């Protein structure tokens, strides 16, 4: 694996592991049923995220108005959050399943953004500009260089370096933050903020249009389910030996906020689908050609 050096045949570092294939494939030591449930929920969440984008791809091809239905700021905020999440997952030494999910996020977002610009430029070709190319180039560069960030061994940070910062200080039962993990924690926090902010432009776009036509509800429904399972998979995982539960939650806090924190905003979007459903039905009936008498 690129992001974590593992010796598949060496199970000695996980003496209490109950299922060896989990260690071999994911590098996670499943010591009991909670750890096994964590892995299972994480896998299901990945399938939810993987399936969520396909209905939107199909919807975009059918309606051809994806550039009107989805807010560009929503897509940019989403892909910005996923890019930060990917970098932060490597630097903060997150669970392998978190890293796998982050990689898929970025790839799916790139395809979604490509479809958006395809329909945008199809209608107005002259809008293609250098800033958009720069954004796509930055995202592509992020995907390419992120695996290289994990090749550097973390350097332990002396306790004096965090004097006055109680959350990141080293206390009994706490796993100390390394310099690389601190950077990853900050980037992960930025990704959580971008996730939260990305929903606001889409909520506004739906409100201004008084419609959710052109958007597949399956996109948000499956993302909500995936985020719920993803957050639960992190919460069910046992802390490392000698690490307190508080320290474990602190290390994973940005990713918990990024997954569970957006559920409220996605619920608002779900309500918009219900409220504007009748409007969309009326608009669709008006566009239907009259049957010949």
From Swiss-Prot:
Residues 1-37, 93-96, 148-182, 236-254 are lumenal. It is a multi-pass membrane protein. Disulfide bonds: none annotated. InterPro entries: LAAT-1 (IPR051415), PQ-loop_rpt (IPR006603). The chain crosses the membrane at residues 38-58, 72-92, 97-117, 127-147, 183-203, 215-235, 255-275. Residues 34-100, 191-243 form the PQ-loop domain. Pfam families: PQ-loop (PF04193). A motif (Di-leucine motif) lies at residues 290-291. GO terms for molecular function: basic amino acid transmembrane transporter activity; L-arginine transmembrane transporter activity; L-histidine transmembrane transporter activity; L-lysine transmembrane transporter activity. GO terms for biological process: intracellular amino acid homeostasis; L-arginine transmembrane transport; L-histidine transmembrane transport; L-lysine transmembrane transport; lysine transport. GO terms for cellular component: lysosomal membrane; organelle membrane. Residues 59-71, 118-126, 204-214, 276-293 are cytoplasmic. The keyword Transmembrane helix applies. Coiled coil: none annotated. Glycans are attached at residue 10. It is found in: Lysosome membrane. Belongs to the laat-1 family. Amino acid transporter that specifically mediates the pH-dependent export of the cationic amino acids arginine, histidine and lysine from lysosomes. PANTHER family: LYSOSOMAL AMINO ACID TRANSPORTER 1 HOMOLOG, SEVEN TRANSMEMBRANE PROTEIN 1-RELATED. The di-leucine motif mediates lysosomal localization. This is Lysosomal amino acid transporter 1 homolog. The lineage of its organism: Eukaryota, Metazoa, Chordata, Craniata, Vertebrata. The gene is Slc66a1.
């Amino acid at each position: 694996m690129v992001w974590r050096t593992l010796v598949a045949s060496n199970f000695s570092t996980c003496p209490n592991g109950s299922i060896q294939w989990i260690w071999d494939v994911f590098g996670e030591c499943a010591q009991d049923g909670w750890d096994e449930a964590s892995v299972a929920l994480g896998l299901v969440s990945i399938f939810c995220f993987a399936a969520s984008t396909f209905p939107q791809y199909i919807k975009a091809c059918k309606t051809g108005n994806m550039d009107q239905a989805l807010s560009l700021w929503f897509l940019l905020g989403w892909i910005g959050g996923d890019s930060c999440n990917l970098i932060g997952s490597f630097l903060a030494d997150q669970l392998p399943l978190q890293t796998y999910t982050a990689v898929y996020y970025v790839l799916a977002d790139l395809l979604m953004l490509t479809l958006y610009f395809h329909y945008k430029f199809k209608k107005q070709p002259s809008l293609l500009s250098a800033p958009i190319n720069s954004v796509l180039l930055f995202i592509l560069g992020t995907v390419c260089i992120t695996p290289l960030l994990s090749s550097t061994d973390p350097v332990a940070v002396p306790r004096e370096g965090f004097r006055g910062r109680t959350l990141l200080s080293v206390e009994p039962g706490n796993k100390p933050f390394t310099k690389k993990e601190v950077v990853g924690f900050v980037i992960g926090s930025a990704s959580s903020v971008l996730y939260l902010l990305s929903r606001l432009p889409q909520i506004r776009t739906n409100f201004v249009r008084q419609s959710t036509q052109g958007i597949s509800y399956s996109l948000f429904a499956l993302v909500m389910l995936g985020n719920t399972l993803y957050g639960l998979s992190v919460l069910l995982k046992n802390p490392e030996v000698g690490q307190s539960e508080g320290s474990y939650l602190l290390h994973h806090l940005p990713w918990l906020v990024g997954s569970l924190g957006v559920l409220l905003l996605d619920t608002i979007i779900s309500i918009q689908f219900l409220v504007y459903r009748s409007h969309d039905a009326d608009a669709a009936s008006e566009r239907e050609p009259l049957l010949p008498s």
